[in-house]
Amino acid sequence: IRNLFILLYQFNIFKRIVPSILRKLSLFKKSQTVSLENFKMNLHFKSSIDREIYLKNHYESKQINFLTSQFELEKIDLFLDIGSYIGYYSLFLYNKIQNIYAFEPNSENYKKLKKNILINNFKIKTFNCACSNFDGESKIWYTDVNKLGGSSVFDENDKEIEKYDFKKILFEKINVSKLDNLIKVVKKKIIIKIDVERHELIVLQGAIKLIKNNNIFLQIEIFDSRKKIILDYLIENGF
């Protein structure tokens, strides 16, 4: 039945219909474990990201193909998946590198990340925390329990939260840590993927020693409006 849904989803006329069917069919009320290219994932169909993976058999193809190409250029010592969600990047790249650290602060996402690693019998090191510029506690916020991939670390300067009815915003207390205090290596070739919903600069501020003391390739998912501040910070610190 999955192959039928994948086939239908390729046609524009079915792009919106098929995900709706998945949400409503009793068959898809619970999670399902599906086989992808070289790994398995347990997917939850109330999540739009999980439905996309189920229907396309892949996720963020352009970004991950570009990232994969970097592993083919030279030997990489370590991959850091910051903002791992339920682990797609880490699982996909495991056949390229087995030394992977995955970071995910949201407790529900983290449980799913751990489950996906377990069903593949992969040895990926996980951290249930957000990367930050200090060690301690903070909180994340989100507005929909079915869209936890968009969880954001709370920042009083982040205007995005003002777009929502404060009464409907959900908060969760989390641990935060500086990458510099978690990973102490030098002269290594490291690829870092960062997808942290406007928290990018804070992550980089807590990883400045790691960046300066190693050969780093960064792939950051970022809004156009935030590109300059990130690039300026990296240039100022010799990246």
Descriptions of predicted regions:
Residues I1-F239:
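Phosphate/nucleotide-binding beta-alpha loop and adjacent structural elements of enzyme active sites
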